[in-house]
């Protein structure tokens, strides 16, 4: 808590609060719905004998390690307020990163065309944010059948072949398989 207050004092409200909000929302996106505020279903009497319902209700903060071993479909949920917070933070970031160039008169057009390094960085961040927002997620493809290129082994030094060819000594079958 002290660290958060120190960061707030160092960076100020305008910079720190949107990033804190984004971090909190992003951290809560990966939490299953039974850990993110939904009442524990273990207290509800189990009328069905479904194993998945028992597994679902058995997990809470004291048994987070069981989540890894459970074979069930994950129930990740994003509620309205998380979506609203994400939209708000993205809107704030896009306005904060947009170049602050006012409408210039004809005389100031030449000065406005000279881009400062801070504006280049802001434009790069804005382009990255736009790319993240418009990127269509594609699940990774699994390549299962790959054939390795079979290269003939060309070893120059094979003592068995040398003995068979030069000395006439043969060890093993007469025909190669």
Curated annotation (Swiss-Prot):
InterPro entries: SecM. Residues 1-30 form the signal peptide. One of its GO terms (molecular function) is translation regulator activity. Keywords: Cytoplasm, Periplasm, Signal. It is found in: Cytoplasm, Cytosol; Periplasm. It comes from the Bacteria. It holds the Pfam family SecM. Transmembrane segments: none annotated. One of its GO terms (cellular component) is cytosol. HAMAP family: SecM. Regulates secA expression by translational coupling of the secM secA operon. Translational pausing at a specific Pro residue 5 residues before the end of the protein may allow disruption of a mRNA repressor helix that normally suppresses secA translation initiation. Belongs to the SecM family. This is Secretion monitor. It comes from Yersinia enterocolitica serotype O:8 / biotype 1B (strain NCTC 13174 / 8081). The lineage of its organism: Bacteria, Pseudomonadati, Pseudomonadota, Gammaproteobacteria, Enterobacterales.
């Amino acid at each position: 808590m002290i660290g958060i207050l120190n960061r707030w004092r160092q960076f100020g409200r305008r910079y720190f609060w949107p990033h804190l909000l984004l971090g909190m929302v992003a951290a809560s996106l990966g939490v299953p719905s039974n850990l993110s505020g939904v009442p524990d279903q273990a207290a509800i009497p189990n009328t069905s004998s479904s194993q998945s319902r028992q597994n679902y209700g058995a997990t809470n903060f004291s048994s987070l390690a069981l989540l890894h071993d459970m074979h069930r479909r994950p129930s990740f949920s994003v509620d309205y307020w998380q979506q609203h917070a994400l939209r708000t933070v993205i809107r704030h970031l896009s306005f904060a990163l947009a170049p602050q160039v006012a409408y210039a008169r004809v005389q100031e057009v030449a000065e406005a065309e000279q881009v400062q390094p801070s504006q280049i960085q802001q434009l790069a961040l804005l382009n990255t944010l736009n790319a993240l927002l418009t990127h269509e997620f594609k699940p990774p493809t699994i390549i299962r059948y790959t054939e390795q290129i079979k290269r003939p082994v060309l070893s120059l030094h094979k003592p068995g072949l040398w003995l068979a060819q030069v000395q006439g000594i043969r060890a093993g079958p007469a025909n190669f398989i």
